[in-house]
Amino acid sequence: MSLLAENLISPVVLCFVLGIVSRWIKSDLSVPEPIYQGLSIYLLLAIGLKGGSAIASTPLAEMVAPALLTLALGVITPVSAFFLMRRLGRLGVEDAAAVAAHYGSVSVVTYLAAAEAVKRAGMPGEGYLPALVALLEVPGIIVALLFASKAGASGGGWKKAMHEVATGKSIVLLGGGLIIGTLCGPAKLADVQPFFATAFKGALCIFMIELGLAAGKRLRDAGRAGTRLLLLGCFIPVVHGALGVAGATLVGMSPGGSAVFGAMVGSASYIAAPAAVRVALPRANPAFYLTLSLGITFPFNLAIGIPLYQKIANLLQSWL
């Protein structure tokens, strides 16, 4: 079975499709907000604990180059997204900066889907990847908002926006989980491992149904964004993702890890970035940045991007 078919025929992706279809047929299906919030807390903490456990048994020197690469791409990706949106997307400064903030950050669920995909393909990635997810979340948002500020865009409170990013649940739970996992190590985490491991994939499937419902709603707004922006919503993740895969391969990451890292870099945030943008760039149009991140790029990565990054990683590995 091809990588594309293998990726599409999986519980995680099909649950996302179920959510989209349910929205399109106007079903009354919904995931109650308390359950959705509980699932997001569970998933984020589980990722952090798993990453922290891996960090505890990984030599620090092995993580230095990937961490520096992550920070570098956290600066490069929002810059490229900003100029592409300005030149090709023909967006104003505020809207371009808002979109760039989303593409400069990371989608945790795209990371999860990519990690599951490479695991099914028999090429699992490095255990410390969750630490890189946390590291990639913030720099791109800051860089994009700086662009808006330097260009004279009228914004809201910077201080409040940065507080939204730094204290948001994704950073608190990912970062907190990483610290707890690192301090405790695999041995002390053994007691809670069954809870965070056994139910993880099932919880992710329910979470994906809710994301499918949200994406289905945003896909209805896709026409307002225009063909030019919709094409950029597919082009940008491929460029960023390929750059991520190439960089990860060059710093010595495995093919599986490089593919997952490419998916991370090629993703667009829909948790941390929207919170910051709403505060710092209140005049930016959500029809652009939310439709592109959740309605276009997220489904694109699930269906096509992840297997593409796997293919690129395998090709680069065979050449080097």
What are these regions (language model features)?
Residues 40-60:
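Active-site-flanking structural segment that lines cofactor/substrate pockets
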Residues 1-22, 30-34, 60-211, 216, ...:
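Alpha-helical transmembrane segments of multi-pass small-molecule/ion transporters
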